[in-house]
Amino acid sequence: MNSVVRQMWEQNTDVVMVDTGNSYEGLCEYVGGKYISYTEEHPITMNPFAIKREELNIEKIGFLKNLIMLIWKGTQGIVTKTEDRLIEQVIKEYFDEYFVNRRIENLSFNTFYEYSIVRIPQIIEENKLSGIDLAAYNYLLKDFYKGGSHEVTLNENLDTKLFDETFIVFEIDSIKDDPLLFPLVTLIIMDVFIQKMRIKKNRKVLVIEEAWKAIASPMMAEYIKYLCAPVKVAS
């Protein structure tokens, strides 16, 4: 695979890789690429809510919905139609509060969490909904809110200079056995690829390798649909 990836890069293809065993460190160094290892001190971070108004589309809402569901339900969790619609409504209303009503100061996971834990109970009451584990939602998502053990993961902006790199390897071996962080960080990286694809016009390739295990679930399959849609448009 090293030789295939190197050949693509030599043919002016931007390469984004997700590695779980330091398999591509040597190649990355050879081509002068950017090698980013996930560590507890320096996690791979991204603020997926920080978007422009024109970027708010069905694909982005779907991505954010899957992100929230992943934290709430886990990769093997079962999401009901009611829960799916509920989170989608909250996401849309959250952005309306920012772009239209100007009642939210900044876009981040922190402000989304603050908005959602107030708005979700209201929607449940307004529509007489039942069977929604609101306590679990509040508790599990709080881990990514300020003060939580993963507070920076979804609140700190990605280094935008990465979009200029032609060869990037994200090494996430240290979290490969974490049932939440592994698929979550893989999602973040895949969204980096989507952003890169929209910004740069040359050919690009996303190589997931062993990290495919992180997205091998029915819930994550929905995100693959999200990923493929703009890829088809770009091609």
Could you describe each region identified by the protein language model?
Residues 6-16, 31-34:
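Post-Walker A helix-loop "phosphate-sensing" segment adjacent to the P-loop in P-loop NTPases
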